[in-house]
Regions:
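Noncatalytic alpha-helical scaffold of FAD-dependent oxidoreductases
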Residues: 1-140
Length: 140
C-alpha cells in the first residue's frame, strides 16, 4: 500500500534506493521484495506474530553480507539476520519493516575436527545437515 501511495505521488519509496544498491552490490538474483518473499521471511519457527520485511537479501559470501550491512547503514535501515528460520525464540521475525539478510545460501560445512571437537560451518547450515555429516563419529 505504501509503495502504491509513493507511486501515485510520483515519489520513490525509501526502499527503492536500498533495493537498487543491493542489486548492484550483491546481484539482482539475490535481492527480492515481492509479496511471496515477504511472506516467506515474515516468520520463523516461533509463535511470535510475523512482520513484513522491506527487502530480502540472500548473500552467498561474507563479502556480500558486508555489502548488505553497509547498504542498510547507508540507508539508515535496520536488518534482521536469518538462518533457516527454524528458531523458536523469534530472533528472525522482522519488526518495523527491516531488511532481512538470509544466510540460507551460505550452507557449507567448512571443517569438522573430531580430535579437537569442533565444526566450522557457515551460518546457513542447519543442525540436521551437521548431524548427518557427523554420523558414525560418536558426535551429533
Amino acid at each position: 500500500m505504501a509503495v502504491n501511495l509513493f507511486k501515485r505521488l510520483n515519489r520513490r519509496h525509501p526502499d527503492d534506493l536500498l533495493y537498487e544498491d543491493l542489486c548492484r552490490d550483491v546481484g539482482s538474483d539475490r535481492v527480492s521484495r515481492d509479496g511471496a518473499s515477504q511472506l516467506l521471511y515474515s516468520r520463523d519457527g516461533s509463535t511470535f506474530p510475523g512482520g513484513i520485511p522491506g527487502v530480502v537479501c540472500s548473500p552467498e559470501t561474507t563479502e556480500q553480507v558486508i555489502s548488505c550491512v553497509k547498504a542498510a547503514n547507508i540507508h539508515n535501515r535496520s536488518f534482521v539476520p536469518r538462518g533457516a528460520g527454524t528458531g523458536l525464540a523469534g530472533g528472525a521475525v522482522p519488526c518495523y519493516d527491516p531488511k532481512v539478510i538470509s544466510s540460507t545460501k551460505m550452507n557449507s560445512i567448512l571443517e569438522i575436527n573430531l580430535e579437537k571437537q569442533f565444526a566450522w560451518v557457515q551460518p546457513g547450515v542447519v543442525n540436521l545437515d551437521l548431524t548427518k555429516a557427523l554420523k558414525g563419529s560418536g558426535f551429533h
